[in-house]
Amino acid sequence: MNTRATHKTEGFVLKTLSYSDSDLIVTFYTRNFGKLTAIARGARKSRKRFVNVLEPFCCSSLLFSRKQRDQLAWLESCQVINEFPEIRKSLDRTLLASYLIDLVDHFSIEEKPGRELFELLRSFLLLIEEGDTSERLLRFFEIRHLKLTGYAPALDCCMICKAPLNPQQRYVFNIAQGGLHCRSCYTTPAAPDVLPISVGTIKTLLLGREIETEKMKRILFSGQTARESKSLLSLFIGHILGKELKSLKVLDEIQRMGL
């Protein structure tokens, strides 16, 4: 006879979906189980259960049960650890946090443990909560997220000749191949999926990929680096997913409007 096993972990709400008149299906990214989907019984109607704990990017202590690993979990209880109130007061912070959550949701696989990714998301949401909405924060999250999910762009050397990064050389980034070509190797005409990129931008991304989070603000992020890194990472992520995330479209539009 199968009995339900009960588990406890911490998790961020990635998204919710109405399941019935009273229930919700909630997708979390958890510390111990990675991406986890559970049914929250009565969450749509009850004024006592799950009140204000199933909002996007809210971090909570979760208690869930299920009979088998491949079955949908039942959310037994959910207690808030951090609802990030300052993020919710600000449109730009909310949109930025929503994009980070969207990235994690689209790249993560159901119940593939990823404690490092959980900690990455937690640390960057805390930075946004404290008021950091910089281009640097966004790009460094993207490059670290790609590394942890196995999609890190090859930025250490030319993919063709394997020569290490050279300050005297010029480079392009091939979106489809996911890496650098030095100008000595890349001689074909310009193409929409091949982007010129400066050595300064490459070095900044490599440093941002590895540096301790609390030291990120020390890294200079020039206008050129901001433009080049945004084009490279946005197009590369879109290539991997086969689409541009709606959350990024909204974020870009609001930033262009200066709201």
UniProtKB/Swiss-Prot annotation:
Family recorded in the similarity comment: Belongs to the RecO family.
Annotated InterPro entries: ARFGAP/RecO (IPR037278), DNA_rep/recomb_RecO_N (IPR022572), NA-bd_OB-fold (IPR012340), RecO (IPR003717), RecO_C (IPR042242)
Gene assigned in the entry: recO
Example of a GO biological process term: DNA recombination
Protein name: DNA repair protein RecO
Pfam families: RecO_C, RecO_N
Keywords: DNA damage, DNA recombination, DNA repair
A GO term from the CC aspect: bacterial nucleoid
Function, as annotated: Involved in DNA repair and RecF pathway recombination.
Database matches in PANTHER family: DNA REPAIR PROTEIN RECO
Source organism superkingdom: Bacteria
Entry-linked HAMAP family: RecO
Signal peptide range in chain numbering: none
